[in-house]
Amino acid sequence: MTNKEIIKRLYHEIIPYKIPLFIAMFAMIVVAALTGAQAYLVKDLLDKIFMEKDVFFLQILPLIIIAIFFTKGVLYYTYAIILERVGQSIIRDFRLKIFAHIHRQSLSFFHNTPTGTLISRVLSDVALMQQAVSTVIIQLLRDFFQVIFLLGVIFYMNWKLALICFLIIPLAAIPIVKFGKIFRKLSTKTQEETAEVSNMLHETISGSRIVKAFCREDYEVERFHRQVETLFTITMKNAKYRVFQSPLMEIIGGFAVAGIIWVGGSEVINGSATPGTFFAFLTAMITAYDPVKRVSQVNSTIQQGLASAQRVFAILDIKPEIEDKPEATSLAPFKESIEFHDVSFSYGTEKILSHINLKVPAGEALAIVGPSGGGKTTLTNLIPRFIDLQEGSITIDGTDIRDVTTNSLRNQIAMVTQQTILFNDTIRNNIAYGKDSCTEEEIRRAAKAAHALTFIEELPNGFDTALGEGGAKLSGGQRQRISIARALLADAPILILDEATSALDTESEREVQKALENLMQNRTTFVIAHRLSTIKNASRIVVVKKGKIVEEGSHEELLKLEGEYQLLYNMQ
């Protein structure tokens, strides 16, 4: 993506704020005009007061200066606060947009994109964009108008000397353009390494138990040291180029001032210019050169912002793999059956499911068993469209799930998985997460049905207990029962249980199993289980091996077949 394309897209984000921007730009123009007037007043200060001894002008000049500075101060505050608000609003919009876009992606997006990278895009990259947007809107626009008015003053006073000033601009532009390309490249590398640091932090902190279990603290510290050392090296390289610009611009400016003093001083000596005109010109030129120098100083910030914007837009340009059709309708309440019609699915070239045909009547508890990697979880992930099938179709009451909105589909499905996901919030809010609005009584009923009410009430803060990240303050069985309470409160007619008890000890499993039995009542349930003892009472059991259903029947029927199910059963 070129700079022009990035700027064009950023421009479209700014358009909604055009009215406050116009107000701020008007204030900037007035401030710039007053800055030009300040420079011009140096001429009258020297010529009329010091040379001509004009007493009247001496009396009114201080009042004029006070009026100019007061007006500039008021207008500066006006445009600065407006532009700060606009800049922050644009960044807020970007954060909301990228956050919403990320959550519209399918599961494969999260499998392929490291968490630290996504965090870096939302926080670090957008923050750098904010700096660039604020710099461009506030500083560059202000400096642009200031330079225009000061150049007008310069040409008005002495066009010959003004031409010398114009020789500076091409010289000053060379390092700005040259270093701009370097900054862009280094900024991209810096943000890539920053994302790697974020990834490493996320992995090691979330996996702290494994790090400690294998005594790998020193190893991880050394690995992190290497990563931050790489980031340090790139950052310092960026800093060297950035800092080098300032003295370079000072040297160029020094030559320009020396030339103007030599030419302008000669004109004063031979009488073709007054001292006031010369010093006013010099003041205007030095004042105008400051914004030119600032362009070189902020060039690094702008290039970092453009590189960050490119990465943010790259995320925003990723189309979700699963989107509602334009003509998609809401799924009617589930009543009859869920059917798989010749369903196949592959990850790349690897076939995971092959020609699955299955009908699950409403109210049935279907257990899905089989060796690891056989396709059990993939089969259930197709129902809520976490992934999309590639061949065949899945229908609910005869309606293809691809013809309905994903929200209406998922609203009729509840899940309890082996990996219990709880948020760093209170127990109450974690249970209520499954329903937009619910009463305290509904939350308590769900907790009671999930066999969680007793231990919740024993906690010092009860339902207001903060769980910590991932529910770290609870045991595995307690976390799972909170998850079951959440599913109960959602009251969805379709239930998916994916290894819901496999990570629990016997006592915890017993409590969770009771809660699951309550949850499964009057629901159509898909149960994935390795512990076959937990699914003996299932209405039907299907054995999935290498992506195919190889056996189907009740527990007793499958044992009589003396096939795959019996092998699995005997292994336990």
From Swiss-Prot:
Segments crossing the lipid bilayer: 14-34, 55-75, 148-168, 249-269, 272-292
What is this enzyme's catalytic activity, as reactions? ATP + H2O + lipid A-core oligosaccharideSide 1 = ADP + phosphate + lipid A-core oligosaccharideSide 2
Q: What GO molecular-function term can you cite, just one?
A: ATPase-coupled lipid transmembrane transporter activity
Q: Where is the ABC transmembrane type-1 domain?
A: 22-304
Quaternary structure? Homodimer.
Q: Which family does it belong to?
A: Belongs to the ABC transporter superfamily. Lipid exporter (TC 3.A.1.106) family.
Biological function = Involved in lipopolysaccharide (LPS) biosynthesis. Translocates lipid A-core from the inner to the outer leaflet of the inner membrane. Transmembrane domains (TMD) form a pore in the inner membrane and the ATP-binding domain (NBD) is responsible for energy generation.
Q: What is this protein called?
A: ATP-dependent lipid A-core flippase
Question: What's the encoding gene here?
Answer: msbA
